[in-house]
């Protein structure tokens, strides 16, 4: 069975490797163009391109697929049975969705219809959801509105960051899409069900500004945001005129004026919130590396009563 693969980041690269390891023929891999990255802004290939080249696969990097006759013709020439799409980052117009014999399967990191859109992992943690998961979806022209082929659940742990949930769902998604491709190969079809009309939510793209901590919110809400925005865009506060990223914290039953530093020691930096307080245990000063509060407190202190 011929499988076109379209994806860009690590989440997608894991699925590509799994599909290849399962023995499916992959005549074409699509990924986004190389982009400048890092402090040196060096042109860097996306993880899917790196994985494809290691696997000896053909890689193409069109800037867009909409109104791109050359790309459309390229896809048609492959005569693929199905396309697997994972965090590709480009819109697939209907004429592209129609090319593969069995359409396009998307690996989506939420339990649809909850958290359609760009940042489902982060929004699930931020909202305090007890669980999330992966859906393999038959793509249509809407935003994550297609019929669901399979659903795979993951219980969000109280300390899970977005990065940790991402890594768990990456493995789940890779295994899930392989299983569905194997079913398609053996039975010639997939049993997809329509998404419920109730319970639809949208996972808006993250912004640096919303990651700024508002100490008037409850400690529980802020703690979830810290985990949801870890590693990027990273929850932050302004300290000495510069942004300081907060990487890990826990809720403690202390009271004070919102934003007031209640204590600063090797045990933690405790800051009052609208309800209860946060004990910060890991942070990242502007221009510096991530560090434990023990390392931070060894070289400096934040005076009790300081308002962040």
UniProtKB/Swiss-Prot annotation:
Q: Which superkingdom, per the lineage?
A: Bacteria
Keyword annotations: Protein biosynthesis, Transferase
Please tell me where (6S)-5,6,7,8-tetrahydrofolate binds in this chain.
Answer: 110-113
Q: Which PROSITE patterns match?
A: GART (PS00373)
Citing just one GO molecular function, the answer is: methionyl-tRNA formyltransferase activity
- Return the InterPro entries for the record: Fmt, Formyl_trans_C, Formyl_transf_N, Formyl_transf_N_sf, Formyl_transferase-like_C_sf, GART_AS, Met-tRNA-FMT_C, Met-tRNA-FMT_N
PANTHER family, A to Z: METHIONYL-TRNA FORMYLTRANSFERASE (PTHR11138), METHIONYL-TRNA FORMYLTRANSFERASE, MITOCHONDRIAL (PTHR11138:SF5)
- What protein does this entry describe? Methionyl-tRNA formyltransferase
Annotated source species: Neisseria meningitidis serogroup C (strain 053442)
Which classification does the entry list for the species? Bacteria, Pseudomonadati, Pseudomonadota, Betaproteobacteria, Neisseriales
What's the gene?
A: fmt
